[in-house]
């Protein structure tokens, strides 16, 4: 975190129902729209909550039980979209990917209306919220909702994807996804929580209807604020929707956002920090911010070339590098990725990001976002080399 941003966090929290705070919030919205390349008529709303809050809000404000969604599930956060659909009873099919594998045309082809992903479409049409959706779906043993029929005969209305599946470090091909959604007239919802600012994002060009991000990744702020950016047609759809939620009803956020406010008390301090951070990015330039992160990622990946790790992602984001240890312990057992995290934390004062679930012992992740330098990269590499010399890798 930048020192200037940290100092703002130490200041007293002001009362927020004021013209001054409203002006700050409207600037936050304007800059978020600009950095997402959202286009004319786009709106950004800010929720006090985690990225998961924004994921759930997006799904329940855009879709109902009369829709059928396609969900890319390549890891923990794709599975989170699946779980949201299950909880709210929204029919879905999931495209399951092996950890570390990229999304390809072959994965999408069975779900295409025409079965042909090779032709460009001139625009994205409104699919309608209840077009030709079956209601005889059942749930198989895996928890996946399915009608039991060939997926190519189903009428899908929406597509949910984490553009960067943070748990495995895979960045999906947005050009491919964009083309598929246009050809099949799907509402496109994108979680860009860990990708925003680290990788190029072209909301309007790609026909993304809604994109969400959080304060704690490349914005390098405390966790607690989620931003949801909607294009013009999504704003209209949200305003016409009926949502059975008080806190997650985005209609209220849109209405209050017109005057630079939120319907409920927000994390005021983080929003003030966000304002200065967005201004700093504007001063540096969006491309400059992205290039800095990219350079850090490339520098780290070059420096670890001789260490006993494998980069497990087929399609990397600049935000992080997912590493699988390839070494063996003295007893012949594989080196634990989680144990590497613990040793770095406890003995070297360095934090990398561990994984959970079945990847906990197999993969850890090194981030390149936030207030980091090439010297920080070198410090981590030196620690890993020392661990290697100690026989810990």
Outline where the language-model segments fall.
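PLP-dependent enzyme catalytic core of the Aspartate aminotransferase-like
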Residues: 358, 362-393
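Conserved PLP-binding catalytic core of the aspartate aminotransferase-like
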Residues: 310-347
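Conserved active-site segment immediately N-terminal to the catalytic lysine
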Residues: 204-216
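Active-site C-terminal subdomain of aminotransferase-like
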Residues: 1, 216-299
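Conserved PLP-anchoring active-site segment centered on the Schiff-base-forming lysine
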Residues: 63-79
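Conserved PLP-dependent catalytic core of the aminotransferase class-I/II
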Residues: 31-35, 278-312, 343
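Active-site phosphate-binding strand-loop segment of PLP-dependent enzymes
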Residues: 103-121, 150-195
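Conserved N-terminal alpha-helix of the aminotransferase class I/II PLP-enzyme fold
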Residues: 8-54, 80-86
């Amino acid at each position: 975190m930048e020192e200037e941003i940290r100092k703002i966090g130490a200041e007293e929290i002001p009362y927020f129902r004021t013209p001054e705070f409203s002006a700050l919030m409207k600037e936050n919205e304007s800059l978020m729209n600009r950095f997402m390349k959202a286009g004319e008529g786009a709106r950004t709303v800010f929720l006090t909550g985690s990225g998961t809050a924004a994921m759930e809000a997006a799904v329940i404000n855009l879709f109902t039980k009369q829709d059928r969604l396609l969900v890319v599930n390549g890891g923990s956060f794709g599975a989170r979209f699946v779980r949201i659909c299950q909880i709210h009873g929204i029919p879905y099919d999931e495209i399951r990917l092996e950890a570390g594998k990229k999304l390809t045309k072959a994965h999408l082809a069975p779900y295409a209306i025409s079965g042909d992903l090779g032709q460009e479409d001139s625009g994205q049409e409104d699919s309608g919220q209840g077009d030709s959706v079956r209601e005889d779906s059942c749930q198989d043993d895996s928890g996946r909702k399915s009608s039991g029929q060939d997926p190519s005969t189903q009428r899908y209305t929406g597509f949910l994807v984490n553009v960067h599946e943070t748990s495995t470090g895979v960045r999906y091909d947005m050009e491919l996804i964009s083309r598929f959604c246009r050809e099949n007239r799907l509402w496109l919802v994108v979680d860009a929580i860990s990708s925003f600012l680290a990788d190029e994002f072209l909301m309007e060009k790609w026909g993304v209807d809604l994109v969400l991000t959080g304060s704690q990744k490349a914005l390098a702020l405390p966790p607690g604020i989620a931003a949801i950016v909607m294009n013009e047609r999504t704003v209209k759809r949200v305003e016409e929707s009926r949502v059975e939620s008080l806190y997650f009803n985005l209609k209220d956020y849109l209405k209050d956002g017109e005057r630079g406010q939120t319907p409920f008390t927000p994390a005021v301090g983080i929003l003030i920090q966000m304002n200065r951070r967005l201004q700093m990015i504007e001063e540096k330039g969006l491309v400059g911010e992205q290039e800095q992160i990219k350079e850090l990622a490339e520098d780290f990946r070059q420096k670890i070339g001789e260490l006993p790790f494998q980069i497990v992602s087929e399609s990397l984001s600049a935000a992080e590098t997912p590493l699988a240890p390839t070494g063996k312990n003295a007893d012949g057992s594989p080196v634990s990725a989680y144990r590497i995290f613990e040793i770095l934390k406890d003995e070297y004062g360095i934090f990398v990001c561990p994984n959970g679930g079945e990847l906990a012992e197999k993969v850890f992740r090194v981030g390149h976002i936030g207030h980091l330098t090439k010297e920080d990269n070198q410090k981590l590499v030196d620690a890993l080399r020392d661990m290697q010399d100690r026989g810990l890798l």
